[in-house]
From Swiss-Prot:
InterPro entries: CarbamoylP_synth_ssu (IPR006274), CarbamoylP_synth_ssu_N (IPR002474), CarbP_synth_ssu_N_sf (IPR036480), Class_I_gatase-like (IPR029062), CPSase_GATase1 (IPR035686), GATASE (IPR017926). SUPFAM superfamilies: Carbamoyl phosphate synthetase, small subunit N-terminal domain, Class I glutamine amidotransferase-like. Its EC number is 6.3.5.5. Residues 219-406 form the Glutamine amidotransferase type-1 domain. The lineage of its organism: Eukaryota, Fungi, Dikarya, Ascomycota, Pezizomycotina. GO terms for biological process: 'de novo' pyrimidine nucleobase biosynthetic process; glutamine metabolic process; L-arginine biosynthetic process; pyrimidine nucleotide biosynthetic process. The gene is cpa-1. GO terms for cellular component: carbamoyl-phosphate synthase complex; cytoplasm; mitochondrial matrix. It comes from Emericella nidulans (strain FGSC A4 / ATCC 38163 / CBS 112.46 / NRRL 194 / M139) (Aspergillus nidulans). It catalyses: hydrogencarbonate + L-glutamine + 2 ATP + H2O = carbamoyl phosphate + L-glutamate + 2 ADP + phosphate + 2 H(+). Disulfide bonds: none annotated. This is Carbamoyl phosphate synthase arginine-specific small chain.
Length: 454
């Protein structure tokens, strides 16, 4: 009887928010800070609750869209994923940072082994508890040291269960991390909305670069909307040398030099990339080249085909989301990170849904009925996450090789293998991609860029 009364007294979920601006005090942290002085920090959701905690990152104030991930591991990969540009990432896993942050070591292809881009991409980090004492053979620094070095504020000691409950019920919201200051309700102008910023322009390479395969068997053009390193690795490791272009490059004008076209993941609203969708539409009208898109690339391909996209209430960000392959009836556990989705009901008649999300029934992929063109909303390259759907890269590369052989049958002199001159002249990594230095600075940079092109 005593135990039954006890369990009845414990709520099964975070409490509802009865007032518009409740204040939640920081809880006692489980990790030891070795008596280091800790500075106060505040996480404020616009028109929502305020959470007081402790700063463990850069001493700066930022704002952006607050989103959450339920991934248990893979925080170095998540935080360097360009798709998180402009977002304050809330981790539901209670303890973050216990295996530290790895080095910037590169593999034999010149790609980063442990990160998905050279810089920390999230605008801010929110955790319940941060581990300052880390242990892993690849670790070279703590999560706090990394955030401070990258200029990204981070807050710990807050009730992430309450934060996630609010975001699930109210939807992804604008929020702010303030370090060493009290919340001022009159400072709503400080909330920067990343949806109003062309974030893809911030993360895309500014000039083409090339990555060679050890044994090149085909040549793929990649549109960089914020491409992850493991996507490039997934292509190169399968024998595809790749040339990576800026997101708005007129790919339809050079597609005849390539055996396939790939459209990468990236941040923000897909409707901002109107030049990209136009170029993809022209590509599908003028070429039979195989095309594969992932995440934002899936959405851009859908827009180019004539479909529409919608913004989800709070998005899907996790490493364990089930997606059903509608062609085989098999379920795959997938890694996802997106706030928009394709409206499958708007797909043209020559397209059909490929995958569907078994949690919320949202579209997870589409495939052309007669051509080698398909795309997925989830990330088959994982990193982090399961590799259930990595076979999709094999399907794509097989179609690329088949296309190459068919073209050689009609045009024996056709050559798509990159020349040594091209390989020597082009850079081997992203060109002029600025790091995240706080969303207010990103917004200022975007405004300056818009003024310069006006």
């Amino acid at each position: 009887m005593m135990f039954s009364r006890f369990f009845k007294a414990v709520p099964a979920r975070a409490p509802a928010f009865s007032s518009p601006l409740p204040v939640y005090q920081a809880r006692t942290m489980a990790t030891v800070r070795n008596q280091r002085p800790v500075e106060r920090a505040t996480f404020t959701i616009r028109d929502g609750p305020i959470f007081h905690g402790k700063s463990f990152g850069a001493r700066t104030t930022i704002s952006g869209e607050a989103v959450f991930t339920t991934s248990l591991v893979g925080y170095p990969e998540s935080l360097t994923d360009p798709s998180y540009r402009g977002q304050i990432l809330v981790f539901t896993q209670p303890l973050i940072g216990n295996y530290g942050v790895p080095s910037t070591e590169r593999d034999r292809h010149g790609l980063l082994k442990y990160f998905e881009s050279p810089n920390l991409q999230a605008a801010g980090v929110v955790v319940a508890d941060v581990a300052e004492q880390y242990s892993h053979w690849t670790a070279v620094q703590s999560l706090g040291e990394w955030c401070a070095r990258e200029g990204v504020p981070a807050i710990s000691g807050v009730d992430t269960r309450a934060i996630v409950t609010y975001l699930r019920e109210q939807g992804s919201s604008l929020a702010r991390i303030t370090v060493g200051e009290e919340y001022d309700a009159d400072q709503d102008e400080a909330f920067t909305d990343p949806e109003q910023i062309h974030l893809v322009r911030q993360v895309s390479t500014k000039a083409p670069f090339h990555v060679s395969a050890a044994d090149p068997q085909c040549h793929v053009a990649v549109l960089d909307c914020g491409v992850k390193e493991n996507i490039l690795r997934s292509l190169v490791s399968r024998g595809a040398s790749i040339t990576v272009f800026p997101f708005d490059y007129p790919i339809h004008k050079v597609a005849h030099h390539f055996d396939g076209v790939f459209i990468s993941n990236g941040p923000g609203d897909p409707t901002h990339c109107q030049d990209t969708t136009y170029h993809l539409r022209r590509l599908m009208e003028t070429s039979q080249v195989p095309i594969f898109g992932i995440c934002l690339g899936h959405q851009l391909l859908a827009l180019a085909a004539g479909a529409r996209t919608v913004k989800l209430k709070y998005g899907n960000r996790a490493h364990n989301i089930p997606a059903l392959d509608l062609t085989t009836g098999r379920c795959h556990i997938t890694s996802q990170n997106h706030g928009y989705a394709v409206d499958a009901s708007t797909l043209p008649s020559d397209w059909k849904p490929y995958f569907v999300n078994l949690n919320d029934s949202s579209n997870e992929g589409m495939i052309h009925k007669s051509r080698p063109i398909f795309s997925t909303q989830f990330h088959p390259e994982a990193k982090g996450g399961p590799l259930d759907s990595s076979y999709l890269f094999d399907i794509y590369i097989d179609s690329v090789k088949k296309y190459k052989n068919s073209q050689l049958a009609f045009h024996p002199s056709r050559e798509t293998i990159p020349s040594p001159l091209l390989v020597d002249l082009l850079p081997k990594e992203r060109v002029d991609v600025a790091p995240t230095i706080g969303m207010q600075n990103v917004a200022a940079a975007a405004a300056a860029a818009a003024a310069a092109t006006a």
